[in-house]
């Protein structure tokens, strides 16, 4: 019997291998991978690469920021942009601010995404109010509903947790089976420097990069690793930007700890020099900020040797006007600018061009860093993140020689920090669950076709079962620590 759809004659790549084969699709799933398949419909992939659709596990969509600014993208514009860039699954954040009821927060985000998303999605939680109700009732309920990861902040006045609160959240994650993601920067260092810069009249965006020091990231990463070790809680450090931070993660992993690292396009392709262009430098302001060429090289090494586990966009789109980056127009100080840069659409093409095409990484590593490890880490594998029999037919067919110069993207930020860069390689046909949703730059997906993905427990979030000496001593005394 003929299959519904066959992707014919392409070069298939997974995280393990690259090979020539047809990919046969029945309904929403991949059902056969071999040569000479017959289908009612075919996609000619001769001379092209057939890759898993990207999984972006760090993006901010229709979310109020820690500074109280709404992201420029809703779930429609963001997922349309993602799809055009070859990403077929996103895991954005449901943000709890202080005083927010976690159940209501999650309900609100479900309603937003259900009505608008054109690709499949999961959720992380942002925990800013770790009271007893949140930790003992609301969080366990959310985890059981398939939201198995949450993010905490060590900086931002509205969001940051102190060390005891972080330990409370980690203990809950360990009990319930969830992964803790950490924005690791030392709040005191940043706040102290920023206060003095503003007082001295140094208000331009370039001072943002000065205040968010390399040391503030390194210290916070080292500290949160120690906290996680105390309660045996796996953690993932998001948007790592410094050689010192990467080395702290590398050292922890060398010691057998479950500490994962993530980096993003802005730390591979931007530097602090991009910010130093007057007020327009706000376009490049994110936290932590881009660093220098040496830090870029450290990030590339981390991706190559595994210290950095995944490559995400940290898509945080804010317009260059009073609604986003410049709430006070040209009087806006760096402390008042919304932090973040758009990146959902260009995450994959940038890494393809400057990673794979320039031989910094292999094609298999490209797939691993952009899709497979995300799915494995966050409980979506093997349904997502690979090309395999039984997997969802989330596939991007890439023309590896297609050349273009970045001018604009399909998100709602109104700018891209990568404008003017040349790309070689672009996804020309994108499928989500067997449906062609993008072809040659044209969208054919209906608003709201995306589905929520309840995530399963993954190997990444399982505790090691390893104790620090003091916890072992408590057991020896028959007075074990109660998490």
Describe the residue ranges of each PLM region:
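Histidine-rich, glycine-flanked metal-binding segment
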Residues: 1-53, 67
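Divalent metal-coordination and catalytic microenvironments
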Residues: 10, 28, 47, 58, ...
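Metal-associated gating/positioning segment near the N- to mid-region
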Residues: 45-116
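Active-site mouth loops of central-metabolism enzymes
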Residues: 59-73, 122-135, 210-214
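Alpha-helix-loop-beta-strand connector modules within alpha/beta enzyme cores
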Residues: 103-119, 168-182
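Histidine/acidic residue-rich metal-binding segments in metalloenzymes
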Residues: 136-311, 316
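His/Asp/Glu-enriched, well-ordered alpha-helical/loop segment
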Residues: 205-234, 281-283, 309-310, 317-402
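C-terminal cap of metal-dependent C-N hydrolases
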Residues: 325-333, 389-453
């Amino acid at each position: 019997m003929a299959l519904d759809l066959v992707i014919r004659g392409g070069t298939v790549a997974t995280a393990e291998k690259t090979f020539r084969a047809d990919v046969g699709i029945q309904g929403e799933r991949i059902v056969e991978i071999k040569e000479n398949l017959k289908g009612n419909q075919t996609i000619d992939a001769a001379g092209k690469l057939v890759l898993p659709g990207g999984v972006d596990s760090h993006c901010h969509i229709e979310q109020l920021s820690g500074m109280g600014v709404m992201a420029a993208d809703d779930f429609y514009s963001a997922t349309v942009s993602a799809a055009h860039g070859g990403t077929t699954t996103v895991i954005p954040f449901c943000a709890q601010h202080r005083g927010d009821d976690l159940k209501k927060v999650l309900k609100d985000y479900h309603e937003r995404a259900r009505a608008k998303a054109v690709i499949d999605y999961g959720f992380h939680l942002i925990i800013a109010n770790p009271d007893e109700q949140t930790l003992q009732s609301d969080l366990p309920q959310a985890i059981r509903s398939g939201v198995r990861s949450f993010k905490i902040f060590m900086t931002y006045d509205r969001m940051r947790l102190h060390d005891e609160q972080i330990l409370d959240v980690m203990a809950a994650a360990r009990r319930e089976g969830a992964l803790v993601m950490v924005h690791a920067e030392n709040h005191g260092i940043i706040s102290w420097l920023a206060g003095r810069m503003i007082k001295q009249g140094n208000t331009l965006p370039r001072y943002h990069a000065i205040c968010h020091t390399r040391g503030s990231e390194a210290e916070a990463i080292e500290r949160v690793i120690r906290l996680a070790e105390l309660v045996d809680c796996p953690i993932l450090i998001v948007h790592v930007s410094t050689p010192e931070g990467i080395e702290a993660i590398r050292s922890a992993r060398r010691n057998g700890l479950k500490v994962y690292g993530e980096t993003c396009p802005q730390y591979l392709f931007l530097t602090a020099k991009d910010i130093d262009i007057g007020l327009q430098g706000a376009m490049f302001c994110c936290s932590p900020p881009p660093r220098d060429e040496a830090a870029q090289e450290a990030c590339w090494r981390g991706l190559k040797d595994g210290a950095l586990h995944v490559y995400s966009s940290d898509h945080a789109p804010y317009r260059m006007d009073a609604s986003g980056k410049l709430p006070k127009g040209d009087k806006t100080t760096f402390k008042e600018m919304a932090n973040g840069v758009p990146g959902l659409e260009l995450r994959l093409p940038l890494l393809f061009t400057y990673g794979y095409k320039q031989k910094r990484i292999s094609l298999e590593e490209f797939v691993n860093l952009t899709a497979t490890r995300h799915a494995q880490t966050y409980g979506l594998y093997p349904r997502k993140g690979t090309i395999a029999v039984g997997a969802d037919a989330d596939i991007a067919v890439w023309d590896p020689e297609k050349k273009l110069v970045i001018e604009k993207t399909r998100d709602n930020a109104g700018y891209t920090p990568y404008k003017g860069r040349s790309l070689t390689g672009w996804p020309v046909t994108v499928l989500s669950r067997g449906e062609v949703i993008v072809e040659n730059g044209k969208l054919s997906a209906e608003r709201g076709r995306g589905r929520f993905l309840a995530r399963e427990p993954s190997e990444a979030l399982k505790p090691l079962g390893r104790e620090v000496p003091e916890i072992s001593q408590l057991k020896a005394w028959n007075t074990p620590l109660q998490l």
